[in-house]
């Protein structure tokens, strides 16, 4: 986006033109589906970059805190996961706005493609009680739970986060791995389903396509390296519930995945890399995350994201401050900054994932009512009824599931 957040969101944004053509367009809002209020609440008078949009306004960092923002903030995130200038991929309006408000330069790295892979890069330092080099990271709920369980994340000073406290949607509060909501902050939620090039495959609606040895896509199919997504979708194909998966279910799912590998249907297992491959044509069908495919429609209009007939997976990615981070206070300021409804709307309008922030829908609706009805940002009851959250695994179960999955992926 190119205009300041106090102005209306840019109606010419490429992302919007494609999200409005989504195969799921026309469903009602997520906040209605969850029975939560959609009005963001400011927790203090607006500061130097106030929002004039309905639904909430940013709040000042508490004046009692005798700290100053740091000169830099080291932020690790996934690709395609923050608003990006259409003409310059190195520019991100949200980060520029944060710099303008606090004077902090955000060193932003799209370095995360897989939770386990990234965990491996920070584990040695955290295990040794050292700074892992990141002030803020975004990881999926199961990995957030693991880091919290290990004691490897900082506890938030919620006094520095009035927006987060006021504007976090109720459905995200009190999760089992952080019942006090002071170790993690949801970044975005999304769904896992089918991503495909309709110009090659035609319309696909069933997970069976991933196991179909069709010459149009055999050998050009990718499964996700995220165990919960890959096993979860496979269980849905088999008519089983991923939210109640057993070790026996894992065995059955792994055997099913192995069939697709042995048949030569599967090209490989990937993180976000599949998105670029869909554009290039190296891949024409993939287990895919909703927002990734919609973003890439700007480069290739024939790409489609589909919630399968059998259902899909629902997940949340979360902001965490690793233990020993050099700039904890500034990381808290950033978390609170993106819980301003105007900033949350700015991000959601580009990434096309489900925003956890109250009031973001009203900001979008004031500027673009059609976008505010996007089922990928605000899923309907009908959509939510078809998606599952993978069960919370014990340490023993997680080890078992991961070992079985690694055997088939080769990782």
Predicted ranges, named:
Residues 1-13, 24-33:
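N-terminal secretory signal peptides
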Residues 322-385:
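Mature extracytoplasmic/periplasmic domains
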Residues 288, 297-350, 410-411:
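Extracytoplasmic/periplasmic substrate-recognition and gating elements
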Residues 34-46:
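Bacterial lipoprotein signal-peptidase II cleavage site
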Residues 143, 222-226, 230, 234, ...:
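Ligand-binding pocket segment of bilobal, Venus flytrap-like solute-binding proteins
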Residues 64, 130-139, 154-158, 162-194, ...:
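A structural signal for short loop-to-beta-strand junctions that line the ligand-binding cleft
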Residues 276, 381-411:
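Conserved C-terminal helix/tail region of periplasmic/extracytoplasmic solute-binding proteins
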Residues 64-141:
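Early extracytoplasmic/lumenal segment of secretory-pathway proteins
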């Amino acid at each position: 986006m190119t205009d300041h957040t106090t102005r209306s969101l840019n109606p010419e944004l490429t992302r919007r033109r494609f999200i409005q053509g989504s195969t799921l367009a026309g469903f009602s809002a997520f906040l209605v589906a969850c029975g939560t209020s959609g009005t963001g609440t400011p927790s203090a008078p607006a500061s130097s970059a106030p929002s004039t949009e309905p639904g909430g306004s940013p709040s000042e960092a508490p004046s009692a805190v005798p700290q100053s923002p740091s000169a830099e903030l080291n932020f690790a995130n996934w690709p395609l996961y923050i608003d990006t200038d259409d003409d310059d991929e190195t520019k991100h309006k949200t980060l520029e706005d944060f710099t303008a408000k606090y004077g902090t330069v955000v060193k932003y790295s799209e370095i995360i493609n897989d939770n386990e892979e990234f965990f491996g890069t920070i584990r040695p330092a955290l295990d040794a009680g050292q700074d892992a080099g990141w002030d803020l990271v975004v990881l999926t709920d199961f990995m957030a739970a693991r880091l919290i369980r290990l004691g490897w994340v900082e506890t938030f000073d919620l006094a520095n986060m009035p927006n987060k406290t006021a504007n976090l949607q109720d459905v995200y509060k009190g999760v089992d791995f952080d019942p006090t909501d002071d170790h993690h902050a949801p970044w975005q939620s999304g769904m896992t389903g089918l991503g495909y090039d309709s110009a090659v495959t035609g319309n696909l609606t069933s997970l069976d396509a991933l196991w179909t040895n069709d010459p149009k896509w055999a050998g050009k199919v990718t499964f996700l390296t995220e165990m919960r997504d890959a096993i979860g979708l496979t269980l849905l194909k088999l008519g089983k519930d991923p939210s109640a998966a057993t070790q026996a279910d894992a065995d059955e799912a792994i055997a099913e995945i192995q069939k697709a590998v042995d048949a030569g249907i599967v090209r490989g297992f990937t993180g976000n890399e599949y998105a670029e491959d869909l554009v290039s044509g190296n891949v024409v069908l993939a287990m895919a995350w909703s927002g990734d495919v919609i973003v890439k429609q700007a480069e290739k209009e024939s790409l489609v994201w589909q919630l399968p007939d059998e259902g899909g997976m629902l997940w949340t990615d979360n902001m965490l401050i690793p233990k020993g981070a050099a700039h904890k206070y500034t990381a808290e300021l950033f978390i609170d900054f993106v819980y301003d409804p105007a900033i949350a709307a700015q991000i959601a309008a580009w990434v096309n994932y489900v925003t956890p922030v109250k009031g973001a829908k009203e900001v979008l609706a004031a500027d673009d009512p059609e976008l505010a009805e996007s089922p990928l940002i605000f899923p309907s009851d009908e959509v939510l009824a078809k998606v599952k959250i993978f069960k919370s695994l014990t340490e023993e179960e997680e080890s078992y599931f991961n070992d079985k999955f690694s055997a088939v992926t080769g990782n």
